[in-house]
């Protein structure tokens, strides 16, 4: 309504500078309040510190400049990831930083990151094995997990079908054999008892 009165540009700029999230508190702390971030310099410092932490432990460090547009996107991605069942489809031109900013948001959230490595011989069998790993880790791991999958990794149409099933139904039909299901139940049993 306000934008239609000719004040749209002012309010759009102000809305872009509204930052809310729990990412200002370090990920290892139990109490992470969801608050408005009013100090943009503090937010920039937090993203740069998270980037430095990631680069210290990563085999593939990232060289990113944390300008305001990038910080806005990291904030959005971090908020989405922290939602229960949070997932995001990031659309844009190649090289625009979607993966790098997602990795940084994952670091800020304190989540584990899982990415597949595509090789020439990578097919449905390897894909299913990787999916099993990520599903078991997500269900039995001690911290939440982000599965980062890029459009450049779609070697087979079945990859997209499996991701669609995970997002819509919460499972990939017939991915686990009966004996694997028994082993999984034994592995996640203690974790499930803690949660409930």
Regions found by a protein language model. Name each.
Residues 1-11:
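Single conserved hydrophobic/aromatic residue that forms the stacking wall/gate
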Residues 7, 85-86, 109-112, 143-144, ...:
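Short glycine-/polar-rich loops that comprise or flank the Walker A/P-loop
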Residues 14, 31-120, 128-131:
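Terminal-proximal interaction/regulatory segments of ATP-powered molecular machines
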Residues 69-70, 126-130, 165-196:
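Substrate-gripping "pore-loop 1 plus following alpha2 helix"
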Residues 81-83, 106-108, 136-142, 155-157:
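Conserved catalytic network of the ASCE P-loop NTPase/AAA+ motor domain
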Residues 95-96, 120-122, 152-156, 173, ...:
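Conserved nucleotide-binding/hydrolysis micro-motifs of P-loop NTPases
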Residues 126-148:
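Conserved alpha-helical scaffold flanking the Walker A/P-loop in AAA+ ATPase domains
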Residues 150-151, 162:
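Walker B catalytic acidic pair
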């Amino acid at each position: 309504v306000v934008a239609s009165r000719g004040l749209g540009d002012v309010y759009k700029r102000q809305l872009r500078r509204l930052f809310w999230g729990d990412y200002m508190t370090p990920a290892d702390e139990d109490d992470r309040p969801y608050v408005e971030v009013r100090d943009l310099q503090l937010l920039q410092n937090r993203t740069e510190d998270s980037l430095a932490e990631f680069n210290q432990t990563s085999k593939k460090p990232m060289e990113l400049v944390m300008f305001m547009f990038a910080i806005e996107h990291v904030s959005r991605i971090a908020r989405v990831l922290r939602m229960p069942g949070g997932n995001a489809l990031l659309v844009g031109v190649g090289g625009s930083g979607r993966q790098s900013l997602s990795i940084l948001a994952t670091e800020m959230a304190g989540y584990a990151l899982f990415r597949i490595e595509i090789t020439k011989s990578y097919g449905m069998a390897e894909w299913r094995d990787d999916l099993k790993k990520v599903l078991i880790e997500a269900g039995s791991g001690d911290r939440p997990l982000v599965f980062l999958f890029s459009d450049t990794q779609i070697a087979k149409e079945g990859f997209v079908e499996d991701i669609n099933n995970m997002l819509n139904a919460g499972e990939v039909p017939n991915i686990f054999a009966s004996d694997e299901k028994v082993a999984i139940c034994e592995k996640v049993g203690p974790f499930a008892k803690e949660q409930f």
